[in-house]
Amino acid sequence: MSGTHRKVLEVLNGRSLTPPPIWLMRQAGRYLPEYRATRIKAGSFLDLCYTPELAVEVTLQPIRRYGFDAAILFSDILVVPDALNRNVRFEEGQGPRMDPIDEDGIAQLSQTGVIEHLAPVFETVSRLRGELAAEITLLGFCGAPWTVATYMIAGRGTPDQAPARLFAYRHPKAFERLLALLADISADYLVEQIDRGADAVQIFDSWAGVLGEEEFQRYAVEPVRRIIASVRSRRPSAKIIAFAKGAGILLKNYRQATGADAIGLDWSVPLSFAAELQKDGPVQGNLDPVRVVAGGAALEHGIDRILDVLGQGPLIFNLGHGITPDADPEHVAALVSRVRGRR
């Protein structure tokens, strides 16, 4: 993969492009009618993730519709606990559920068979690289150990992930064992995605923002550093984006501490601070997804502010989190058009 003509890769290598490349987190999702039709055909959400033909289709849908500069593998961060036999399921209107894990359960966890369980995901990556135009960057991904662990401890998502925080305070050794195991599995998972054709990968730490300063270093920074070091020890040229949602001022040293090439920013990050972070390397973000729902002047103003402040440096234009199901596909088209119209 030379990747010299793939705009997202160019930015990850430190180049500044005008207009910047654009893709959106959850760009393949429920806001698109074609996605909803494919989702029904799949049966369950996990069946959609594990059926390469359908996962390829939903990955390509937003590329066909909008011509984004990157396609991100359609899967979910919770396929890793699913591969660890945690009985993961997605219940309509309730979000993900799985069997909660305790100290004894953590002691019994094993990496055996995990990568084999994820073979359909790797098949999807291989097929995607064959289907995508040469100029489109293919992104793989995984969940950060802290975020994945929050679901494993509680058995579901919670508003502030208090169950995982409490478990970490009460059982720090068991919790750190869980994070280390997840980091090692995630590194293997990303290496395999890269080997199958992913040009770059992103690590999603969606719940990093609930951690205090000390815990952030221990549970968000260290496991992600471990993943990146492991991937780079085997694939030195790997390009990696790390997204720690809600981390705020703790992002100041996040890139250096983890070794990430680029850092993703949520919409709460002040653009003045984002500009400081951009001096050290590429940034990705950070439009409020609700502006896409709103459309019109609110959408245009949000886009223009980001481009005015960050558009002269290495920027991958994205949202500050995933696009929401109530977004109008026409508003997404307007977003892409406005970003690409910047000169």
Swiss-Prot record:
Q: Which PROSITE patterns match?
A: UROD_1, UROD_2
Report the locations given in the UniProt record: Cytoplasm
**Which keywords appear in this protein's UniProt record, sorted alphabetically?**
Cytoplasm, Decarboxylase, Lyase, Porphyrin biosynthesis
A single Gene Ontology CC annotation of this entry is: cytosol
Q: Does the keyword Cytoplasm apply?
A: yes
Q: Which reaction does it catalyse?
A: uroporphyrinogen III + 4 H(+) = coproporphyrinogen III + 4 CO2
Please give the InterPro entries that the UniProt record associates with this protein.
UROD/MetE-like_sf, Uroporphyrinogen_deCO2ase_HemE, Uroporphyrinogen_deCOase
Give the domain of life. Bacteria
Query: Annotated pathway, please?
Result: Porphyrin-containing compound metabolism; protoporphyrin-IX biosynthesis; coproporphyrinogen-III from 5-aminolevulinate: step 4/4
Transition state stabilizer (site feature) positions: D76
Q: How does it assemble?
A: Homodimer.
- What is this protein's record name? Uroporphyrinogen decarboxylase
